[in-house]
């Protein structure tokens, strides 16, 4: 999603921040620059869109989505670009599909996971039954308005899509845009030249220099449609009693974070304590998130053996799961972001998570879900727990703090340290 500019048309510095160079040089004294940045420099407007009369399926937009779509439509048709910043479950996919329908242009969706590509295909055929969905490649020059191409950045790496190989006008949708503005993905984005651009993310932020890429490609705050949708859940913050002894680098002296995750993952007593706590809620359909694949497998075995219930796993190349299973265990990378499992009513954080936690909490799509949030005995883990607690408070969750001795699973039933109460009045845990 680049603009091709002559270098002599650029007054000032090229786009970038810190270590992030957000441009690539082209022959003839030109450069490919991020879409929104280039549009501002050129002062150009997008070409007019000619909506096609396409019939919707059985899915219709909800009132709160119509207001968001109206704002997004204004940005895309007047500037050419927009960022939809809406929480998980708000309906960003369907709003993007409706905007595509109204534009009447072929579309390309960039997403970084196959499971998300499958969800796009299924959503498109539900929402717009006449859609032709292709899960590889990019729109050719003769692509039709009903043609939707869904692909990953890896397939476009080392390619430059020439203007003559693409439609004169097409919409580019970037799903989970915060993930697709990494150093490698930015080079891919600079190889695509759409006429209209839409970014989707519940958390459009990065923790490195490439945070600047989000504004350069999708526009600043005045091009962002921002919504919140608090969903109160019942949260149990469980002090496990497990003491973590991290390792430290002999060279830098810094904590080896992998050693912390390994200590959490290689603790069968801790797994059993979590399983026993989850069994106290047999009516909840759990999603358990882990960092390591070996932990996913062991946790699934523990849950299956202690419950006698159906347990499924999600990791690696596995994209399908049993929606009737009592518990689905997956990695954060597989099931923590963009994962659409509306049937899940419980979330267990079997390994620590800090950044982008809002994405994980968003896997619970309905109000009144259950969250089991274990906290081990280590300063940085307690700090991450406080960060997650702030997210719970913002969502209006009810928080209950308990403790257990995870070294003795047979006695692992949590003991309350404070009564259940609304989040704003949550007590601090005793130290």
Curated annotation (Swiss-Prot):
GO terms for molecular function: ATP binding; DNA binding; helicase activity; hydrolase activity. It comes from Frog virus 3 (isolate Goorha). ATP binds at residues 86-93. Pfam families: ResIII. It is an enzyme of class 3 (hydrolase). Keywords: ATP-binding, Helicase, Hydrolase, Nucleotide-binding. The keyword RNA-binding does not apply. Residues 403-431 are annotated as: Disordered. It comes from the Viruses. The keyword Nucleotide-binding applies. InterPro entries: Helicase/UvrB_N (IPR006935), Helicase_ATP-bd (IPR014001), Helicase_Restrict-Modif_Enz (IPR050742), P-loop_NTPase (IPR027417). Its EC number is 3.6.4.-. Coiled coil: none annotated. Residues 73-222 form the Helicase ATP-binding domain. PROSITE patterns: HELICASE_ATP_BIND_1. A motif (DEAH box) lies at residues 175-178. This is Putative helicase 055L.
